[in-house]
């Protein structure tokens, strides 16, 4: 099997690092709800739209950029991240923490904690979309989320200390 998503290369007309994938209702929905939901892939955006969350967008992969955060921050300062429940999603979340203050120290970025058995939003939608509203309520500030994930992954106190010093 090939990759789940095959993204276009950059061209004169398309610059991936400046674009987000979303439906036409995104901007009005973000303004109405007061927050945006960022997910990893196209199918996640479509799944959330089916669940009534048209305030969702995707950077078309895990590489969220400063330019994309700036674009979203024009409409809201509250962002809920829900990247895939895997190592790449976790690394992408760490990167968002690194770049968020370059955009604005007013940005509030929280993370949704997917149940372990689900890889992403589209799996939740396929199996049990009704639980998403509970997942949405149970969000953590990005730094709390990353600390929790790191502590879950290691019992080595030195590694934990070094991680805290890094963030």
Task: Give residue spans per PLM region.
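Residues on a specific face of well-ordered alpha-helices
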Residues: 24, 70, 94, 119, ...
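Generic structural signal for secondary-structure transition and capping sites
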Residues: 35, 77, 140-144
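C-terminal or mid-to-C-terminal helical accessory/interaction module adjacent to the motor/catalytic core
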Residues: 109-167
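Hydrophobic, secondary-structure "cap" segments at the distal end of domains
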Residues: 25-32, 105, 143, 160
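A compositional/structural signature marking long, glycine- and acidic/polar-rich segments
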Residues: 62-80, 148-164
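Hydrophobic alpha-helical scaffolding
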Residues: 16, 38, 58, 62, ...
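Conserved phosphate-handling catalytic cores of large alpha/beta enzymes
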Residues: 64, 73-135
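Phosphate-handling DNA/RNA-contact segment within nucleic-acid enzymes
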Residues: 1-75, 91-93
């Amino acid at each position: 099997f090939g990759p789940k998503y095959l993204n276009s290369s950059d061209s004169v007309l398309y610059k991936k690092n400046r674009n987000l994938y979303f439906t036409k209702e995104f901007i009005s929905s973000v303004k109405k709800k007061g927050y945006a939901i960022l997910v990893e892939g196209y199918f996640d955006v479509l799944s959330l739209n089916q669940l009534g969350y048209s305030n969702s967008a995707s950077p078309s992969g895990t590489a969220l950029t400063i330019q994309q955060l700036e674009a979203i921050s024009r409409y809201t300062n509250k962002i809920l991240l829900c990247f895939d429940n895997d190592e790449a999603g976790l690394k992408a979340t760490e990167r968002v923490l690194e770049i968020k203050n370059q955009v604005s120290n007013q940005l509030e970025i929280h993370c949704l904690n997917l149940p372990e058995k689900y890889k992403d939003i589209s799996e939740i939608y396929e199996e049990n979309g009704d639980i998403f509203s509970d997942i949405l309520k149970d969000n953590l500030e990005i730094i709390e989320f990353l600390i929790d994930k790191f502590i879950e992954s290691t019992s080595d106190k030195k590694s934990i200390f070094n991680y805290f010093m890094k963030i």
